Amino acid sequence: MLRTSPAGSLRAEHTAQVVTLTGWVDRRRDHGGVAFIDLRDASGIAQVVIRDEAVAHPLRNEFVLQVTGEVSRRPAGNENPNLPTGEIEVVASDVVVLNSAAALPFQVSTALADTEAIGEEVRLKYRYLDLRRPAPARAIRLRAKANQAARRVLDAEEFVEIETPTLTRSTPEGARDFLVPARLAPGSWYALPQSPQLFKQLLMVAGMERYYQIARCYRDEDFRADRQPEFTQLDVEMSFVEQDDVIALAEKVLVALWELIGFTIPTPIPRMTFDDAMRLYGTDKPDLRFGNPIVELTSYFADTPFRVFQSEYVGAVVMAGGASLPRRQFDAWQEWAKQRGARGLAYVTFPEDGSDLGGPVAKNLSDAERAGLREATGAAPGDAVFFAAGATTPSRALLGAARQEIAKRTGLIDSADQEGAWAFVWVVDAPLFKPTGDAADDGDVALGHSAWTAVHHAFTSPTPEWIDTFEQDPGSALSNAYDIVCNGNEIGGGSIRIHRRDVQERVFQVMGIDAAEAQEKFGFLLDAFSYGAPPHGGIAFGWDRILALLTGSESIREVIAFPKSGGGYDPLTQAPAPITAEQRRESGVDAVPDDETAPQA
């Protein structure tokens, strides 16, 4: 080794020892011909004293040094209580420059790095420098600890870590595949996996019983904020289990992860049906750090003279203290709603003095409606109430978004104490199918050719109550699925899987996939189900999202070592990039397959 001690490990008890340190010049200070170097390595910082001006003169930030010297106590009054090594310094007897550093595109020093505003494109272009900064480095190191914590839990539960293929065939899974040309089979292509879903089910058929993998996944999606074309999930599958078994195991993993940041998750985590989540919070990812649920007023306005409220659905959400907002802020709320595809956001105000309702909607309501509205909505004097009316799903979604925005603007989230800083909930009993048009609206690729496609994926089992009848009413059938939500973020999702060939074929039929197409695209899975497939289920955790929450990061890019920027571009390597004519020829990108011999995509 080029060093005897990590820089951050030195303490007062090491005084008088001669050590050799290696690391980067974090910063330097000069006092009367003596240079003080903060030497940084992965363990921390130690102050190095260089008394030879000729040696110290050329040293600049981010030079890589090897320093040999004696550990000494700092003079009284010069200790640094903010550093674990703040009681000592190393008086250098020998300094070797292992490498110099060019002028930096941004500050890396721990003293400056977290306060300097740096553009994301520059950070990603020089990611190897960015990761020297304290906050990015901490995020990546915590990710490693999270991997270890999950493995400890799963190893203790006798799970087997198995790697599944990353070169496979293209199968419809809800997004576009990244395709890889097969050089030895011109005109044919591999696909990178969107998830290990089919392989982990095959592992259950194979008798592995308990599988997990920290899996790399790939989806060729249109640009969405805070999405990555390649991402990581903790993938888990179990045989001979029911929903409660998978949830109990998943909670053990979550408890271990949040213990890394000193928080104990109360278990069992509460559960909420999909219908209740949509009715009360307008989303299947409710943020339960605060209350203020949506109030349904459809029945209340059943006989209303106000034409706007003569709708399929009328709902409201309260903004505490909102009555005092100036008119321009209410106008800004209208623009906020229009940006979300709504025509606006109707509102009334309840004055502090108890006088008659304010706001443009009030004059359109009957006397009885005005008189009972405060009680119906739960509003107090001084509050404002926002309304949405129209089709149920988009109206609830608008109110759910308004509820979240109200919480941000009024400090409901920021005021949560440590115990309330994290709110977990399982959302269960989601629909099995959704209209194909809804998938397109969500930016997903609908699987199949009928009016219905899968909400989760095509391999999710119906609930026991629906397993024999789901074809009769696809829009009402429920899935044996469960999503885990933390602070309004979906951080994992799973289901009990279909393990019978006949049930899987019936699900395909609802989705417009006939027997021939099912055999062509999923024959390997259907055939496996014919050989004694056990009942099984599992869950996949969104690893990047979980790590973003654990580290307090605004974006998942902060917890990925080398992330892509918007549109899947990598400023560091400038990928994606054109290939040469020779590469095109060798890879067979332009080859046209022989229809008689080529495998069907």
Curated annotation (Swiss-Prot):
GO molecular-function term, one example from the UniProt record: aspartate-tRNA(Asn) ligase activity
List of residues binding ATP: R219, D220, E221, Q228, E490, G542, W543, D544, R545
Entry's EC annotation: 6.1.1.23
Compartments, as annotated in UniProt: Cytoplasm
InterPro entries associated with the record: Aa-tRNA-synt_II, aa-tRNA-synth_II, aa-tRNA-synth_II/BPL/LPL, Asp-tRNA-ligase_1, Asp-tRNA-ligase_1_N, Asp/Asn-tRNA-synth_IIb, AspRS_core, GAD-like_sf
Principal localisation: cytoplasm
Enzyme class: ligase
Region (Disordered): 566-601
Reactions it catalyzes: tRNA(Asx) + L-aspartate + ATP = L-aspartyl-tRNA(Asx) + AMP + diphosphate
Classification via SUPFAM superfamilies: Class II aaRS and biotin synthetases, GAD domain-like, Nucleic acid-binding proteins
Positions of the UniProt region annotated as Aspartate: 197-200
UniProt keyword list: Aminoacyl-tRNA synthetase, ATP-binding, Cytoplasm, Ligase, Nucleotide-binding, Protein biosynthesis
Keyword Ion transport: no
Biased composition, class Acidic residues, residue ranges: 592-601
GO biological process: aspartyl-tRNA aminoacylation
Site (Important for tRNA non-discrimination): H31, G77
Residues annotated as transmembrane: none
Protein residues bound to L-aspartate: E173, R219, H456, R497
Subunit annotation: Homodimer.
NCBIfam families, sorted: aspS_bact, PRK00476.1
Role, per record: Aspartyl-tRNA synthetase with relaxed tRNA specificity since it is able to aspartylate not only its cognate tRNA(Asp) but also tRNA(Asn). Reaction proceeds in two steps: L-aspartate is first activated by ATP to form Asp-AMP and then transferred to the acceptor end of tRNA(Asp/Asn).
Family: Belongs to the class-II aminoacyl-tRNA synthetase family. Type 1 subfamily.
HAMAP family: Asp_tRNA_synth_type1
Annotated protein name in UniProt: Aspartate--tRNA(Asp/Asn) ligase
Organism: Beutenbergia cavernae (strain ATCC BAA-8 / DSM 12333 / CCUG 43141 / JCM 11478 / NBRC 16432 / NCIMB 13614 / HKI 0122)
